[in-house]
A protein has these predicted regions:
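Core segments of cupin and vicinal oxygen chelate
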Residues: 2, 11-54, 171, 182-224
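Short glycine-enriched loop/turn motifs at secondary-structure junctions
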Residues: 4-6, 64-68, 115-116, 173-175, ...
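Hydrophobic adenine-recognition pocket in adenosine-nucleotide-binding enzymes
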Residues: 10, 71, 179, 245
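Vicinal oxygen chelate
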Residues: 15-18, 72-131, 138-140, 151-164, ...
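Short, charged/polar surface micro-motifs in flexible loops or helix N-caps
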Residues: 49-51, 62-64, 76-80, 222-224, ...
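Short glycine-/small-residue motifs
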Residues: 53, 133-134, 226, 299-302
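A short, polar/charged loop-to-alpha-helix boundary motif
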Residues: 139-153, 307-322
Length: 336
């Protein structure tokens, strides 16, 4: 089994590319990695080059017609190089570059390299057709003029190395933390993500006899990053948001987020989209969060893991002051 470190990349759909580039760059402070007006699309580094990435695409632009959803998982380079063989042994087809004949990626025996990052990748499908990706950042200088090349081509002709990214980010966002996808069969998908990709089930949410409901899975261990999967027809959260992406921040920055968002003309929201003046706490994690909308209604979240034991018996969703009161009474640390 390939050991996934954390969610690396997520994609959302927007109406106006330039407006959204401005929002994610100027309001959230994300660093533009590359703009592709011919698609049209843009990719942002989250937390600095190589940490995690957000892609935004306009309605109707490629690749939104060719996939239900896309998730990227960061892995070690040595595991990535072994991924094609391991995927085939599990009955899954590894994929590389997209071509007119293979719009979801041509069959491959080796990774491909996105030279502008640079990073090596292998793509594959989950049981519902969500396009998944294993990705490993490369310790090389970006070479955007090369486009997308096979691993053997990159490895043969690229020798310049650097010790690190050298990026000084201006944003308090540390990394991409959470993404959600829709699935047809919840039990089947829990099995796939748990047994095939090695994720740990964090919590199951309101499953009905028909199998509707959802699950949240830890990636790379509790507190690293998280994937939410929801069956088609679930009433939550699919009806309250176009798409959801969570960004990990420090607790200090989270506590000032409602005020900072208001100063930028953005309304701070709770988990049920109600206006708030303080974070909310998901006690089963536990983590504190502040939600807000981007210009297209994508449901965004700042999140900070808390240094406490999970306390779901306090209620799954509390205000920050309620959680703090519980901690002062010794309830939030009763199992330490």
């Amino acid at each position: 089994m390939i050991r996934i470190k954390h969610i690396f990349e997520a994609h959302i759909i927007v109406r106006d590319l330039q407006r959204s580039v401005g929002f994610y760059r100027d309001v959230l402070g994300l660093q533009v990695g590359i703009e592709q007006p011919e698609r049209p699309a843009a990719f942002f580094w989250v937390g600095g080059r190589g940490k995690s990435m957000l892609g935004i695409f306009t309605i109707g632009s490629w690749p939104t017609q060719m996939m239900q959803h896309h998730l990227s998982f960061q892995v070690k380079l040595e595991d990535l190089l072994a991924a094609p063989q391991r995927l085939r042994c599990a009955g899954i087809s590894p994929k590389g570059r997209r071509t007119p004949s293979y719009p979801r990626g041509e069959p491959t025996d080796e990774p491909i390299v996105f030279a502008w990052m640079p990073a090596a990748s292998i793509f594959f499908d989950d049981p519902d057709g969500n396009l998944l990706e294993y990705i490993a950042m490369l310790p090389d200088l970006p070479r955007p003029e090369l486009g997308i090349v096979r691993w053997s081509e990159w490895n043969a002709g690229h020798t310049t190395r650097i010790a690190g990214s050298g990026t000084n980010t201006m944003t308090p966002v540390e990394q991409l933390f959470e993404d959600h996808i829709s699935v047809r069969d919840l039990e089947r998908s829990i099995g796939f993500y748990r047994d095939m990709l090695g994720m740990e089930v964090g919590v199951l949410q309101s499953r009905s006899p028909e199998g509707m409901g959802g699950a949240l899975l830890w990636i790379g261990g509790r507190g690293r990053s998280m994937l939410g999967i929801y069956s088609l027809g679930s009433t939550w959260p699919l009806t309250i948001m176009q798409h959801h992406v969570a960004f990990e921040v420090t607790i200090e920055d989270l506590l000032t987020a409602p005020r900072n968002l208001r100063a930028a003309g953005v309304t701070a929201l709770g988990g049920r989209r109600e206006p708030i003046d303080e974070p909310v706490v998901f006690s089963w994690m536990p983590a504190a969060s502040v939600f807000f909308d981007d210009p297209d209604g994508n449901f965004l979240e700042y999140i900070a893991m808390l240094d406490d034991q999970p306390q779901p018996e306090l209620g799954l969703l509390l205000s920050w002051s309620e959680w703090q009161s519980g901690r002062k009474e010794g309830k939030a640390k009763s199992h330490k």
